[in-house]
Regions:
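Nucleotide and nucleotide-moiety/phosphate-recognizing core
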Residues: 2-8, 17-131
């Protein structure tokens, strides 16, 4: 049996739907991004997320049966956005019998800055959307 080598990751905690498909590089413990998209979706994640996931998988040339795991953003962020993300991820993971991992949205943003070369302290700020 061949080893599954792809990860599906997405987040809807904020006003953007972020979706990515990556190849697990087991030898180097890294992930090579094959397809990704960020789409504005102010209060519309529930109507756009599945289509964006399907499009990312198609762009990457990866079938759902080739996925090794699912990762989803777990906030902080919009309460409804986090619930949409978590419920979708749980449904996909259960339906495909895959492990599911929750990732802090703040950690993901900080690690993105590290990958872009930032060193030292990194502070992630987010709009609390309160007036």
């Amino acid at each position: 049996m061949s080893q599954k080598n792809y990860i599906l990751a997405f987040d809807t905690a904020n006003e953007i739907i972020a979706v990515g498909v990556g190849k697990l590089e087991r030898e180097t413990a890294t992930i090579k991004v094959l397809a990704s998209c960020e789409t504005p979706a102010f209060r519309a994640s529930n109507t756009k997320l599945i289509a964006k996931i399907d499009a990312a998988l198609e762009d990457a040339g990866v079938a759902k049966s080739e996925l090794a795991c699912v990762a989803c953003g777990r906030g902080p962020g919009s309460f409804t956005g986090v619930r949409i993300c978590t419920a979708t991820a749980k449904g996909i993971a259960l339906g495909l019998d895959l492990p599911l991992f929750g990732v802090s949205t703040l950690d993901a943003q900080a690690w993105d800055q590290w990958a872009k070369g930032a060193r030292g302290e990194v502070v992630v700020l987010g709009d609390a959307m309160r007036i």
